[in-house]
């Protein structure tokens, strides 16, 4: 049975600090995503982002945490009779759940209906993600004898969230005019600077995401090592994105995020140079992965969650088991076989679960907005508003 470790008051504050930064990452997700698509759908997308946050908080309280760490903790959480240890742990972990679920909007932007999206967020945040969380951090893999290391969620959060989002986008189908005679067409974003700003907000919050994955505040060497590895992966991601895209601003900004995604798994184990290499690889692969998803799989991945989250998460999980990227005293702690098995299991849960959830919603209440609403713009057609004044 999973037990939350005892925390001193300073550890509780440390977890609240981390949870606050992870919560603020939501602002980064919103800005990064809305900048990458058309202005006529911006306000609608903001509503989706707000609703998935509420959905996860509700679902994770009543069922998700129980699946992850044991249902004996549910009643204390619901009734407010929990101790500081449980409350602090729940606050941090619900933010991880919210991060995993909110990735999905990047793949389904500009065409999904509000109600099925909200229901999907409830199911993913309350059931599907907690299954993965139990395996990774709740003792599931360990009980099965699988040595899987995922310190801050390259696999549990990003590989999972990216693949679920791709499955939702696959079920939805591409946006109108995305493919003409089977060939993908560029649909430019309306505000690249706000997307880049969003990437910076995400990077700021990522320090809480990674450093906050420590068991407490006492081990200063661990915290400093995690912070340094995070910083070097960020740099590698930027350079990789710039090199592979010939300085395209979106790929460069997304490269920063890709590097941060990839470093999460082994951020406590990588050397600074190892972290840089991991970030570099994640940044470089973006345009090639995006092209494969767009041209071969025919999935309209609006905000590149495939390369930024799914593929970068996979790279991070695998790299956490490669000895030459790790500190000398870390090599014995991980197994490349365990990393590969863990990645396969997470991917299967995300792909199969995502297809079942979103295909089920599509067959029952319908996933997609009308063709007319999509052409007019969801802000005007559904919300009767606009994101920007015409004056």
From Swiss-Prot:
The keyword Transport applies. One of its GO terms (biological process) is ammonium homeostasis. It comes from the Archaea. Pfam families: Ammonium_transp. Activity is regulated by the nitrogen regulatory protein GlnK1 via direct interaction. Formation of the GlnK1/Amt1 complex is decreased in the presence of Mg-ATP or 2-oxoglutarate. The presence of both effectors abolishes the formation of the complex. One of its GO terms (cellular component) is plasma membrane. It is a multi-pass membrane protein. The record marks 158, 309 as: Twin-His motif. Important for optimum substrate conductance. GO terms for molecular function: ammonium channel activity. The chain crosses the membrane at residues 12-32, 51-71, 88-108, 112-132, 152-172, 192-212, 223-243, 261-281, 305-325, 338-358. Keywords: Ammonia transport, Cell membrane, Membrane, Transmembrane, Transmembrane helix, Transport. It is found in: Cell membrane. Belongs to the ammonia transporter channel (TC 1.A.11.2) family. PANTHER family: AMMONIUM TRANSPORTER (PTHR11730:SF6). Homotrimer. Interacts and forms a complex with GlnK1. Involved in the uptake of ammonium/ammonia (NH(4)(+)/NH(3)). Transport is electrogenic. This is Ammonium transporter Amt1. It comes from Methanocaldococcus jannaschii (strain ATCC 43067 / DSM 2661 / JAL-1 / JCM 10045 / NBRC 100440).
């Amino acid at each position: 049975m999973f037990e939350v470790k005892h925390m001193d008051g300073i550890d509780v504050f440390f977890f609240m600090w981390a949870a606050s930064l992870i919560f603020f990452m939501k602002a980064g997700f919103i800005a990064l995503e809305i900048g990458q698509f058309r202005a006529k759908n911006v306000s609608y997308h903001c509503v989706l982002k707000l609703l998935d946050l509420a959905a996860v908080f509700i679902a994770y309280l009543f069922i998700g945490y129980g699946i992850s760490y044991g249902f004996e903790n549910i009643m204390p959480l619901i009734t407010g009779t929990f101790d500081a240890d449980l409350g602090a742990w729940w606050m941090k972990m619900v933010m991880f759940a919210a991060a995993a679920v909110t990735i999905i909007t990047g793949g389904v932007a500009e065409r999904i209906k509000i109600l099925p999206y909200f229901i999907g967020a409830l199911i993913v945040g309350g059931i599907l993600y907690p299954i993965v969380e139990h395996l990774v951090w709740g003792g599931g893999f360990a009980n099965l004898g699988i040595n899987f290391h995922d310190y801050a969620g390259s696999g549990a959060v990003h590989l999972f969230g990216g693949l679920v989002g791709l499955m939702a986008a696959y079920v939805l189908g591409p946006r109108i005019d995305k493919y003409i005679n089977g060939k993908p067409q560029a649909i430019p974003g309306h505000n690249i600077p706000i997307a880049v700003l969003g990437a910076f907000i995400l990077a700021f919050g990522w320090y809480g995401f990674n450093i906050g994955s420590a068991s407490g505040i006492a081990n200063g060497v661990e915290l400093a090592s995690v912070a340094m590895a995070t910083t070097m992966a960020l740099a590698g991601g930027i350079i990789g994105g710039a090199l592979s895209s010939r300085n395209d601003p979106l790929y460069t900004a997304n490269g920063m995020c890709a590097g941060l995604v990839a470093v999460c798994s082994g951020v406590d184990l990588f050397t600074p140079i190892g972290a840089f290499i991991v970030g570099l690889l994640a940044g470089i692969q973006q345009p090639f992965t995006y092209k494969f998803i767009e041209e071969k799989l025919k999935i309209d991945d609006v905000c590149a969650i495939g390369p930024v989250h799914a593929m970068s998460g996979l790279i991070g999980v695998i790299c956490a088991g490669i000895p030459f990227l790790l500190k000398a005293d870390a090599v014995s702690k991980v197994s490349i076989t365990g990393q590969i098995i863990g990645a396969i299991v997470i991917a299967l849960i995300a792909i199969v679960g995502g297809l079942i959830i979103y295909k089920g919603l599509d067959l029952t209440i319908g996933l997609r907005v009308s063709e007319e609403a999509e052409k007019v713009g969801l802000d005007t057609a559904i919300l009767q508003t606009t994101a920007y004044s015409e004056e």
